[in-house]
């Protein structure tokens, strides 16, 4: 194994979406530091934080059927039944929803909670309220995906927040995705909601910590054997 390969295995990858931001912070650091060294140190800290924010670590994703995996890093902020956003076309009856709130310190790369085919992508402009508020689901800017599976349709909604002002979607309508695949990113603090079909049973509670691509949020059948994994 070469030295470069060894370093790559030890260093957490940076998502390409962050390159322009990291480069901008780096240039600003050099310019400010040339005028006043304390500003250079501040800029260096900001550059390091930006690189940390856009980190994209490899995750060990359970592959067993019947499991719903967290789409985001963060804290479970809601578990309950809520009407899905109308633009998703999932009906007007309340569906079970699990919300994951991401702070500015969490990894913000979002992943598919289940494997399936993306049958709809719906973007809706809106406000930039605190993403931890209940009304953020209705009022904030958001981007929703509907994933069709053999067990039913799942809704995944990326919600912008007070600081987050840019939702990035990596996938296209009609595309087939695997569980744990990268589906998008939200810059600088936000929330992801997962709407589950009626057969799902939540396995997490409010306040629980979630890891994108790894934490099991719910199961579609009892007693799923969690033995198979993939690195993603």
Curated annotation (Swiss-Prot):
GO CC, alphabetical: plasma membrane
Alphabetical UniProt keywords: Cell membrane, Decarboxylase, Lipid biosynthesis, Lipid metabolism, Lyase, Membrane, Phospholipid biosynthesis, Phospholipid metabolism, Pyruvate, Zymogen
Site residues (Cleavage (non-hydrolytic)), renumbered to this chain: 189-190
Metabolic or biological pathway, per its Swiss-Prot or TrEMBL entry: Phospholipid metabolism; phosphatidylethanolamine biosynthesis; phosphatidylethanolamine from CDP-diacylglycerol: step 2/2
Residues the record marks as active site: 190
Membrane spanning stretches: none
UniProt GO molecular function: phosphatidylserine decarboxylase activity
UniProt-listed GO biological process terms: phosphatidylethanolamine biosynthetic process
Cofactors: pyruvate
EC class: lyase
Residues with the Pyruvic acid (Ser) modification: 190
InterPro entries given in the database record: PS_Dcarbxylase (IPR003817), PSD-A (IPR033175)
One Pfam family of this chain: PS_Dcarbxylase
Membrane topology (UniProt): Peripheral membrane protein
Entry superkingdom: Bacteria
Cofactor details (free text): Binds 1 pyruvoyl group covalently per subunit.
Maturation and modification: Is synthesized initially as an inactive proenzyme. Formation of the active enzyme involves a self-maturation process in which the active site pyruvoyl group is generated from an internal serine residue via an autocatalytic post-translational modification. Two non-identical subunits are generated from the proenzyme in this reaction, and the pyruvate is formed at the N-terminus of the alpha chain, which is derived from the carboxyl end of the proenzyme.
Similarity comment: Belongs to the phosphatidylserine decarboxylase family. PSD-A subfamily.
UniProt-listed PANTHER family: ARCHAETIDYLSERINE DECARBOXYLASE PROENZYME-RELATED (PTHR35809:SF1)
Subunit structure as annotated in this protein's UniProt entry: Heterodimer of a large membrane-associated beta subunit and a small pyruvoyl-containing alpha subunit.
Protein name, per record: Phosphatidylserine decarboxylase proenzyme
Originating organism: Methylocella silvestris (strain DSM 15510 / CIP 108128 / LMG 27833 / NCIMB 13906 / BL2)
